[in-house]
UniProtKB/Swiss-Prot annotation:
Keyword Metal-binding: yes
Composition bias type Polar residues, residue spans: 651-677
The organism of origin for this protein: Gallus gallus (Chicken)
Homology family: Belongs to the MRE11/RAD32 family.
Underlying gene: MRE11
UniProt-recorded name of the protein: Double-strand break repair protein MRE11
Cofactor(s) this protein cannot do without: Mn(2+)
Active site location: 129
UniProt-annotated binding residues for Mn(2+) 1: 20, 22, 60, 247
Subunit structure: Component of the MRN complex composed of two heterodimers RAD50 and MRE11 associated with a single NBN.
Keywords: Chromosome, DNA damage, DNA repair, Endonuclease, Exonuclease, Hydrolase, Manganese, Meiosis, Metal-binding, Nuclease, Nucleus, Telomere
Length: 700
């Protein structure tokens, strides 16, 4: 293949690759609050400057599952600024977009929308931070997709089987099959791969003429028996896998020796954890693809905050530190101060060479005090650097080295694991564990209202969809249903009779599985509705500031006043109270502190708040409990791969294929482990099709 220049690009795809941008991370921090937004703008600037065909993101565009209004607004602002314009898009989509974007209300790529003017489309899968949740299975990326600023692909709604249909792209004579799979809990996806429940669909015609890219967002390094996805699980016809979720930058593609495809790990564009993997220089990649040849150009990010980390083992300096010396703590503190100053000097020299870099660096000194040493007070030490570092509270980290037992882990034969017969499938699921537990549990802890199936589905909602109110709402829903059943039957308020009727009711419900499923769906819908209602009520309460509290003061009248809960009308009701006479305003027995105007413990009457743990007996002596409006957040933590690989080398792939330009939208399922002519290798500089390409490399 002849060498091409930047002006001869009609057959060459230019793709900007990035992942784990984590917009909104520490957005309330006075120093680091804007770091993610600044770096995101830099990434878009590089894409615009290099006139890429499209941007490919590997997940975790947002740090929070429900980003703040500031984060959403800033993201939309950047996308409108850099992605909209009059420049024509030079590639076309050949696949059936109704299949690629089947979960979208606008099932087509955004640049083909006649109402939009997109010149630089973005394709992105979701990560574990911004994954779809709730009854409607929506995420923040769906907001951007609905606005026409991003193409969200790689979604899977089934927990039983996943069919990955590629987006087929063509530019000139180069054809790319873009596969994507959004974040799925690693244990579940591992099980699905083993059970052969994941299938990658391929075009029926000229399947060897496509450059196959796969974007994935999972654990790449092993963190447990099944808490990661081995590279050997991926199909061997893939040419390049873009691996998100791992934050260490290993963007130079590395070849898998068994599957023979290449894997690039761009890493995060912002430091989210003070670990060694995050200290590696941050890069994004400019990928060029022509035919089945590729070349990755690394672009160093200039706006990333400098991060220096160093380890100190006190036991390695016996000439300086003696644990029996009464002044050893002062000596350790002086030694640590010297180390921190050295790192600050290095950070300042690096910043002077790059004016776009933030002024305050991230500094962390990890001190191993094994050997009888005692740590000093970190808080006092940190105060000396409040104005010089971005993380003053985390400068010093003391730890003790623990000798780990050597694990005799034999290498796993993944080929044998994937070729297991169906009779040996791994069928362990959360809902099955719940059912097994309650069926074998002692009588005193067995379920009396819910069936094992219902509880298992509630736990599945809690685990898989992060629906924090799932279990609570299902229990409440079934409690209310049982109470209504008992009231309708006019059962005497005797515990034995009630228990017997509850048992009969439970058995009748267990036999009707369809009605059980409907009740679970109704309870989950109500959980979402109650959570939304709670947000509205909380907002109204903060705006009005005078909502009734429903609490009875302990020092009020000793008279037997029925305490009933009634929601006030906020500010309007408080103003009405001002119109009363002065005697009414000062009638509280406790004086000024308890006036109706200034205290929440006034002499109003309130309904009692039912106990959350209400029993069946409450059906006969209390009102129906009100739904919970509690909300909770879920925080995920990324595990960083600490291996470092900053080597840079151009890569090219070659294959003897026939180029065909016919459009295709049908696919055929192919075995993932079939042996075929790969046609993927490293080429020498003499054969590099981009040898004469004028590329501007950024200074590291």
């Amino acid at each position: 293949m002849s060498a091409v220049s930047l002006q001869d690009d009609e057959d060459t795809f230019k793709i900007l690759i990035a992942t784990d941008i984590h917009l909104g991370y520490l957005e309330k921090d006075a120093v680091r609050g804007n770091d993610t937004f600044v770096t995101f703008n830099e990434i878009l600037e590089h894409a615009q400057k290099n006139e890429v065909d499209f941007i490919l993101l590997g997940g975790d565009l947002f740090h929070e599952n429900k980003p703040s209004r500031k984060t959403i607004h800033t993201c939309l602002e950047s996308l409108r600024k850099y992605c909209m314009g009059d420049r024509p898009v030079s590639f076309e989509v050949l696949s059936d977009q109704a299949v690629n974007f089947q979960l979208s209300k606008f099932p087509w790529v955004n640049y083909q929308d006649e109402n939009l003017n997109i010149f630089m489309p973005i394709f992105s899968i979701h990560g574990n931070h911004d994954d779809p949740t709730g009854v409607d299975a929506l995420c923040a990326l769906d907001i951007l997709s609905c606005a026409g600023l991003l193409n969200h692909f790689g979604r899977s709604t089934s927990v039983e089987k996943i069919d990955i249909s590629p987006i087929l792209l063509r530019k000139g004579r180069t054809k790319i099959a873009l596969y994507g799979l959004g974040a799925i809990p690693d244990e579940r996806l591992y099980r699905m791969f083993v059970n052969k429940q994941v299938t990658m669909l391929r075009p029926k015609e000229d399947e060897d003429s496509w450059f196959n890219m796969f974007v994935i967002h999972q654990n790449r390094s092993k963190h447990g028996a099944t808490n990661y996805i081995p590279e050997q699980f991926l199909d061997d016809f893939i040419n390049l896998a873009v691996w998100g979720h791992e934050h260490e930058c290993k963007i130079t593609p590395a070849q898998n020796e068994q599957q023979h495809f290449y894997v690039t790990q761009p890493g995060s564009s912002v430091v989210t954890s003070l670990s060694p993997g995050e200290a590696v220089k941050k890069h994004i990649g400019l990928l060029r693809v022509k035919g089945k040849k590729m070349k990755m150009q690394r672009i160093a990010l200039e706006t990333v905050r400098t991060f220096y980390m160093e380890d100190v083992v006190l036991a390695d300096h016996p000439e300086l530190f003696n644990p029996d010396n009464p002044k050893v703590t002062q000596a350790i503190q002086a030694f640590c101060m010297e180390k921190v100053e050295m790192m600050l000097d290095n950070a300042e020299r690096e910043r002077l060479g790059n004016p776009r870099q933030p002024q305050k660096p991230l500094i962390i000194l990890r001190v191993d005090y094994t050997g009888g040493f005692e740590p000093f007070i970190v808080h006092r030490f940190s105060q000396k650097y409040m104005d010089r570092v971005a993380n003053p509270k985390d400068i010093i980290h003391f730890f003790r080295h623990r000798e780990q037992k050597e694990k005799n882990d034999n290498d796993i034969n993944f080929g044998k694991l994937l070729s297991r017969p169906a009779s040996e499938e791994v069928t362990l699921r959360v809902e099955d564990l719940v059912k097994q537990y309650f069926q074998t549990a002692e009588k005193k802890v067995q379920l009396s209202l819910l069936t094992e199936r219902r509880m298992g589905e509630a736990v599945q909602e809690f685990v898989d969809k992060e629906e924090k109110d799932a279990i609570e709402e299902l229990v409440k829903f079934q409690l209310e249903k049982t109470q209504r059943f008992l009231k309708e039957r006019h059962i005497d308020a005797e515990e034995e009779k009630i228990d017997e009727e509850v048992r009969k009711f439970r058995e009748s419900r267990r036999k009707n599985t369809e009605e059980e499923d409907e009740e679970v769906r109704e309870a989950m819908t109500r959980a979402r509705a109650h959570r939304s209602e709670g947000v509205v009520l909380d907002s109204a309460s903060s705006d009005e500031g005078l909502m009734d509290t429903g609490m009875k003061a302990s020092g009020d009248s000793d008279d037997d006043i029925p305490t009933t809960l009634s929601r006030g009308r906020g500010r309007g009701r408080a103003r009405g109270a001002r119109g009363q006479n002065s005697a009414a305003r000062g009638s509280s027995r406790r004086g000024r502190g308890n006036t109706s105007q200034g205290s929440s413990t006034s002499s109003r009457t309130y309904k009692s708040v039912p106990d959350k743990n209400s029993s069946i007996m409450d059906a006969f002596r209390s009102l129906k409990p009100e739904p919970s409006q509690s909300t909770s957040k879920f925080f995920s933590e990324d595990i960083i791969d600490d291996e470092m690989d900053l080597e840079e080398s151009p890569i090219s792939l070659s294959s003897k294929t026939n180029q065909r330009s016919s459009a295709m939208s049908s696919f055929s399922k192919r075995g993932s482990q079939s042996q075929m002519s790969r046609g993927v290798d490293f080429e020498s500089d003499e054969d590099d099709p981009f040898k004469n390409t004028a590329t501007s490399r950024r200074k590291k």
